[in-house]
A protein has these predicted regions:
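Fe-S-dependent hydro-lyases/dehydratases of central metabolism
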Residues: 1-353
Length: 353
């Protein structure tokens, strides 16, 4: 340590890092626009301004709307991974993403991968559900992102069908089996789903992180009751789906889905809300608290005098909160803090829904 103190001086680091943000000569030669905000290049096929908020503008944010007469975009099986939903591999020339790049004068040898073009939502939404290994049972005998548009019954890519539905402002839902969203926590698996116009995913079970990502993008993760599935309900994709009560959706709340079949027969099915998240604070600003509830995030408040600092939390703890499925306004609820060395601490919280 004495040798290090003699040999290593603060001035060495200061001189090395003094121009760290200037870069080398090659970096400084790159031409770039100057300004307070990023100047989007509309001709770039790698980076585009995402369209997540294009339909908002200056409008007041409304309550979450019910899903009325939605069309089914896909009927999927078990263990659909995030790579099935949003592949990161190479882009095929005959895919919707490949067609987009070709129209933008990119040669096929320069298509690169979905992962490398994740900064362009136009590519990524075209790649959603486009994995060649995915099988949509609405189009039996096919592989890849293929579906059957309703009511025309024309077979087309999932992306093209989503665009057709968007023209008529038709909401969409996706049905799946067990373990939907397993694999890596790929954010575009949720982003792409939302951009295609999907309002809800109804599955037999969900992977935790992808389920949370869906909620973050405003897509409702809804779970079949034990023993139910889209296969047992004999869905074929021609049905219309209505789901009421999304504006008041709470963690693990039971909610009803109405299936309108082609011949006019209706089937009512109970689903379970899989929104299970919480924010714990000493106090909440009213509007933000309301927004949290609207997104299915439970706002929970410490008792007077308590705080995470006083509880000496460092982030290594595990948190258990029971009773979120029956949460009422200003209800007292208990949080259990499991610390690294096995000691548990019980803390009372107050529901601020």
């Amino acid at each position: 340590s004495d040798t290090a103190r003699k040999a290593v001086k603060p001035s060495m680091f200061k001189s090395r890092y003094a121009n760290v943000f200037k870069g080398d000569t090659g970096w400084r030669k790159i031409k770039a626009q100057k300004g307070q905000t990023f100047d989007w290049n509309t001709k770039s096929t790698y980076v585009q301004k995402p369209s997540f908020f294009d339909d908002l503008g200056d409008k007041e944010i409304k309550d979450i709307q019910p899903i009325n007469s939605a069309r089914i975009l896909a009927l999927l099986g078990d263990s659909i991974t995030t790579d099935h939903i949003s592949p990161a591999g190479s882009i095929k020339a005959d895919s919707p993403a490949g067609s987009y790049l070709t129209k933008n004068k990119e040669k096929s040898q320069n298509f690169n991968s979905y992962g490398s073009r994740r900064g362009n939502h136009e590519v990524m939404m075209r790649g959603t559900f486009a994995n060649i290994r995915i099988r949509n049972q609405m189009a039996p005998g096919t592989e890849g992102g293929v579906t059957r548009h309703q009511p025309s019954k024309k077979q087309m890519s999932i992306y093209d069908a989503a665009i057709e539905y968007a023209k008529s402002e038709t909401p969409l839902v996706v049905f799946a089996g067990k373990e939907y969203g397993t694999g890596s926590s790929r954010d575009w698996a949720a982003k792409g789903t939302r951009l295609l116009g999907v309002r809800a995913v109804i599955a037999e079970s969900f992977e935790r992180i992808h389920r949370s990502n869906l909620v973050g993008m405003g897509v409702a993760p809804l779970q079949f009751a034990e023993g139910d599935s889209w296969a047992k309900l004999k869905l074929d994709g021609s049905e219309k789906i209505t789901i009421e009560g999304l504006d008041e959706l709470k963690p693990r709340q039971k909610i009803q889905m109405v299936i309108e079949r082609a011949k006019g027969r209706n089937t009512k099915v109970n689903l379970l809300s899989r929104i299970v998240r919480a924010v714990i604070a000493e106090s909440f600003e009213r509007i933000h608290r309301s927004n949290l509830v609207g997104m299915g995030v439970a706002p929970l408040q410490f008792a007077e005098g308590d705080s995470w600092a006083k509880l000496k939390l460092d982030g290594s703890e595990k948190i258990t909160i029971e009773g979120l499925d029956e949460l009422k306004p200003r209800q007292k609820i208990q949080m259990v803090i499991e610390r690294a060395k096995g000691r548990n601490t019980k803390v009372n919280l107050l529901s601020r829904i």
